Amino acid sequence: MIDRGALMSRYSRASDPDIRSVFHREFEGNQKRSEDFYRRIFLEYGDESIAELVTAQVGIQNVSNVISKVIEEIRIGLSYLEKSTRYVAYDRKVDGHYLFMQAEKIGLSGEAAREYTDLCNRLFDLYSSTLPRIEEEISRQWPIESFDFNIDGNPRNYKELDENGRKLAQKSYRSSVRSRALDDARFILPASTLTNMGVSGNGRSFIHLIQKLMEYGVPESERLAHDLYEELKGEFPQIIDDALSQHGQDIINYKRSLASLFPYTDGGRFEKVRLIKYSNEREEMQKVLALLMYPFAEDASGIISRIKAMELSEASAILERIRDLRKNRRMKVGRPFEAVNYVFEVTTNYGAFRDLQRHRFLSIVRKPLTVSYGFDVPPIIAKMPDLSEEYAEAMKDAERVYRIIKERYGAWIAQYAVPFAYRYPVVFTTNLAEATYFIELRSTPQAHFDLRDIAIRMYNEIKSVHPSLAGIIKFVDTGDYPLGRLSAEVRKNVKAGGI
């Protein structure tokens, strides 16, 4: 892989217009030349951009849901796929163990290790017994006969379908019930739950990832940083060395010093979604219109003068025409709308935060996971008295174990004991283009109900301060869908050819 990067970097400095000629003349059959080239340009001259010309794909197995979120904080240069708690059940043991990070691997011993292990086993036992009970309750509350199915372009009630239609409807319904049960049951899983990740990216970003894992400073993250370093040395040896060089260690120490500037405290009052920073709508509209017109008109100052002279109704009419041009949510609003910025504070549960974080244009600032803000109860479990009591007891036990671990090992290690149900406040900056994409995508029926709630609340917050600009968010869906994946499952099965 390193020879390809060296070739592209050398090509950027060559007068020869044919990259093949450069390869044949300078690199073909000469691996040492490409390594020497990288050593000279990257290490001696400090040209870090050439580290973006080599790429690798890495599988990371059995990483906790504490550290997987640290990994996914690197938002530029790395792409991720992660095992989903929405579609994959965690009710089976592997080699006699549930899939959570073992106590010794996170640095626990003695009483804290026993309490932690007992808690995780209890949570996984409850999760495993809860899944079928939730499925049964969903089927009782929303039987298949209560739904219409659009199989041939003509929505009909289940009772009106022919035999083949009923078979397809039953298959779609079972998958939807299972998905909804997994959505509710995942609240029980602890942050120590293991996941698998596929990571694809360039050398420069892998350097940043290794340094971030070292900076985080818990046993799992430091162990993973060294494992990644050793694995990637075979792919781009001259580049990855920079991650843990003296220069790299200076960066790690600097980030750790920043993190220690303020003592860790928790507490406060948090709303589900709160817009905490925005600008005057008229000024923001003028900015958007100026950027929309810039490719087709005079200099920026001339455009701005013209727009300032516009009546508000004229400016609104232009935005309305853009709205009318959008026929579906995949027709994105465009870069000029990125100039409108917002800062939100969102308090959701840790399970939903994991989905929120995948939107890389949300610049998230977050805290360690804690039990201090209480926990959410998923809707189906809340309607089942016996199960909701078991659930609440398990959450209280998690709080007790968290405090035991925190007292001895600190807040960062104690995160592993916290279930996904616990509330997790974060702040993020975004812009109108990304907010439009997020709101329209995450308000679709098949989105997780917590993400739908966040998306709809964000829309309402934006609409309350920027009513004209909010009109561009055309495809927000505020409907109520007890089985949100049902229509998507029907479409999938119809496309697959039925049964």
Curated annotation (Swiss-Prot):
Single GO term (MF): NADPH binding
Indicate whether GTP-binding appears among the record's keywords: no
User: What are the ThyX domain coordinates in residue numbering?
Assistant: 1-246, 271-476
Q: Which domain of life is it from?
A: Archaea
Name under which the protein is recorded: UPF0159 protein Ta1429
Tell me which Gene Ontology terms the entry assigns under biological process: dTMP biosynthetic process
Describe the family membership recorded for this protein in Swiss-Prot or TrEMBL: Belongs to the UPF0159 family.
Per UniProt, which keywords does this protein have? Repeat
Q: Which Pfam families match?
A: Thy1
